[in-house]
Regions:
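Membrane-proximal loop-to-helix boundary features in eukaryotic membrane proteins
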Residues: 1-159, 164-168, 175-178, 183-278
């Protein structure tokens, strides 16, 4: 005799109403679109903060971990296309894992921004290692610049003041070898290289109109207008740019986490009622 009982609503089953079949066919694309809408903007914000040219110096590159989120979304999409029905583990993984990754990174960036904005604004040059190291690097650059100005003043007869108005550290003959620690032939000339520190300090002077590091001082690389110490400028970027954007990521992900939990609780009984294994 004919078997009675709930029929599993598998896509393509001729016994099922067209609406239900269409809903199942649409599910993989709809779920993937929800994931893209939820996670694409926070992912972009985290990457933008991490790659910011001012923040980069103090930031580890762990933020690139967020690039695994599109991979998770694609894998979950492929599972749903292959199975033809919502798969509980895939749904939970596709919604919760990217959320936690972004929440963690947003939180780390927020706490880092609060810490750095305070310590960089402080007049204490020793508030943390990175700040102290950059001050030493700036002092090394100033020493080179000062010697260079003195030597040029002796050779040309021009006053130090006039030379300091027009002459910049990169105009000094020995600048490149001290910067890289290498001679023109590529042999080691100095014990250390200043490439990372001096490139960063030069970028700040040329693009953020500052001079000196811990305190406002002689501009070494740029001739543009300047009014603040570069550490104050970086502190402001952490406070006015990094902190609010990182906070935004955290708020978005906490809201999404709550909405996801509610959806999963409500979705279970509905899917089971339609004969799906959930």
């Amino acid at each position: 005799g004919p078997a009675y009982g709930p029929v599993s609503p598998i896509a393509g089953d001729k016994e099922q109403p067209d609406g239900q079949i269409d809903m199942l066919k649409m599910f993989p694309a709809a779920f993937t679109m929800i994931g893209a809408l939820l996670f694409s903007v926070p992912t972009w914000i985290v990457l933008t903060i991490g790659r910011n040219s001012v923040v980069t110096y103090f930031q580890s590159e762990t933020y690139y971990m967020v690039l695994i989120i599109p991979v998770i979304t694609i894998i979950v999409h492929m599972i749903h296309v292959r199975k033809g029905v919502p798969v509980k583990l895939a749904v939970v993984t596709g919604l919760i894992l990217p959320n936690l990754i972004l929440l963690w990174h947003g939180n780390v960036m927020y706490l880092n921004a609060v810490d750095k904005s305070d310590k960089l604004f402080s007049s204490d040059c020793n508030s943390f290692n990175g700040k102290r190291e950059l001050q030493r690097a700036w002092e090394a650059a100033y020493g080179l610049y000062s010697n260079c100005i003195n030597q040029t003043a002796l050779n040309t007869g021009h006053s130090r003041e006039k030379l300091m108005d027009t002459f910049r550290i990169q105009d000094c003959d020995e600048y490149k070898s001290v910067l890289t620690g290498l001679t023109e032939e590529g042999t080691r000339a100095y014990a250390e290289s200043h490439v990372k520190d001096w490139t960063y300090l030069r970028h700040l002077e040329e693009n953020h109109f500052c001079a000196g590091w811990c305190y406002h001082a002689q501009q070494l690389w740029s001739s543009k207008t300047h009014k603040d110490a570069c550490s104050t400028v970086v502190s402001d970027i952490y406070g006015s740019y990094v902190r609010p954007h990182a906070s935004q990521v955290c708020m978005l992900m906490l809201a999404a986490l709550g909405a996801t939990a509610m959806m999963l609780i409500m979705l279970g009984p509905v899917l089971r009622r339609h004969g799906l294994d959930w």
